Amino acid sequence: MTPEVFMLCVFAALLVLDTTYAFQLTFSRGIIAAPLMSLITGDVMAGIQIGVFTELIFADVSPLGGILPPSAVVCSAVSLALNAMGIDLYFAFFFGVTGSILFSVAEKFMRKNRFKWLVFWERKILQKPNTVNRTVALALATSFLMNFILIFIFTWLCGKLMLTLLPYIPMKAHFACKFAYMAVPWIGLATLVPAFRLKAR
């Protein structure tokens, strides 16, 4: 695990806060987050590519009701981190997609359990109103720490696994993953066609 990958995980954990917990300035969108994170690894073109692919692959997932969409930040972070560790982008991206889906499941669980903490913090603020800033900062720090732990552990495990298996992966598997990776934008665009058709009517 290089310092660049570690810093990437830290930055990703901060960007995840932009989705719901703080600011909401759309920095957590894949098309923005991936190029920003790629500045850490030094491969901006890979960041732009991952950002576009992430936007397209999750284009038809809408955060409505109880649906929590996969995290574009996690997808981008895992993909770029694994690529920085020497894993081909066409392998890294699919680990990123898997990580983003698992992260959304974990986040849904954390949000359910966070309600108890919110009640506790609300009572604390009502008792001591002057502690509101400290309480909010503590809540954000807790969310950041949980995000970092989840992203770091998943990236580390995937990196170890792929670096171990990479010499034994046959060329046919490389070709299949390359083909699947290059099909991602077309699949994403295909999911948008019905949406545009409905808007046009």
Regions found by a protein language model. Give the residues of each.
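Helix-loop-helix junctions within the multi-pass membrane cores of secondary transporters/permeases
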Residues: 89-158
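C-terminal transmembrane helix-loop-helix hairpin of multi-pass membrane proteins
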Residues: 6, 134-201
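Hydrophobic transmembrane alpha-helices
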Residues: 1-72
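Long, highly hydrophobic alpha-helical transmembrane signal-anchor segments
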Residues: 56-97
